[in-house]
Design a protein with these regions (language model features):
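A long amphipathic alpha-helix within ATP-dependent nucleotide-binding catalytic cores
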Residues: 151-212
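Active-site nucleotide/adenylate-binding loops and adjacent lid/helix of ATP-dependent enzymes
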Residues: 5-173
Length: 212
């Protein structure tokens, strides 16, 4: 928590939220089914979405869309989120990893593109950033695991401890998809994303794009 003040006015904040945000608005943002419904009613183009069901139903949804996103209905900071899942086994494993955050798990069709974070205050866009997944740069000597640890320390130092790259199942899945593991040595000068998601808390990088 922190406080912004100007003159005699003070507003309490948590990350990008303020005490001006209503409880109803928080609910609409926190529950991703309600978020989807609200944006759909506003006429926006959205990914297909459904609750995870039986393994057969989940596999059929995957076959229909080719690649999926799995996420808990209620959550934040990218916890329990996995993207670009292409096999039934990966989908089911991601569902199990999401359940500790919420028993209700969503499946969505996956679409490539920019990951944007936009801050709106008083119906005015005041900040915008492209979020990029955590990445490492090979030096031909250190293993990918060592490079991740080093980059994670740099991200923690730059963000006051908020950002680090977890060496978890999602990071390992990303490495395996590229043909690597933690013990592999990345060629010198080769840059590689080690996460599919771009959340700040999992090592993601923010690039200001308000003036683009």
């Amino acid at each position: 928590l922190f406080t912004l003040s100007q003159g005699g006015r003070r507003i309490r904040c948590r990350e990008s939220l303020t005490d001006l945000t209503s409880a109803v608005t928080m609910t609409l943002c926190q529950d991703k089914r309600l978020t989807h419904r609200t944006l759909s009613r506003a006429g926006l183009s959205l990914p297909a979405q459904r609750l995870a069901g039986s393994a057969e139903d989940n596999a059929a949804f995957l076959a229909e869309h080719g690649s999926l996103v799995v996420k808990p209905v209620d959550g934040e900071q990218g916890q329990g989120v996995a993207v670009d899942l292409r096999t039934p086994a990966d989908v089911q494993a991601a569902i199990e990893r999401a359940r500790p955050f919420d028993e209700r798990v969503l499946l969505e069709s996956y679409h490539e593109g920019f990951d944007l974070r936009i801050v709106v205050i008083g119906f005015e866009v005041v900040a915008a950033a492209i979020r990029r997944p955590a990445e490492i740069l090979g030096d031909g000597r250190h293993t990918i695991g060592e490079l991740i640890d080093a980059q994670s320390r740099r991200r923690q130092a730059a963000t006051g401890g908020e950002s680090r790259i977890p060496k978890d199942a999602e990071t390992l899945r990303t490495l395996h998809a590229a043909g690597y593991d933690y013990d592999s040595v990345l060629p010198q000068g080769k840059r590689m994303a080690v996460r599919k998601t771009a959340n700040l808390h999992t090592g993601g990088i923010l690039e200001d794009c308000l003036l683009y």
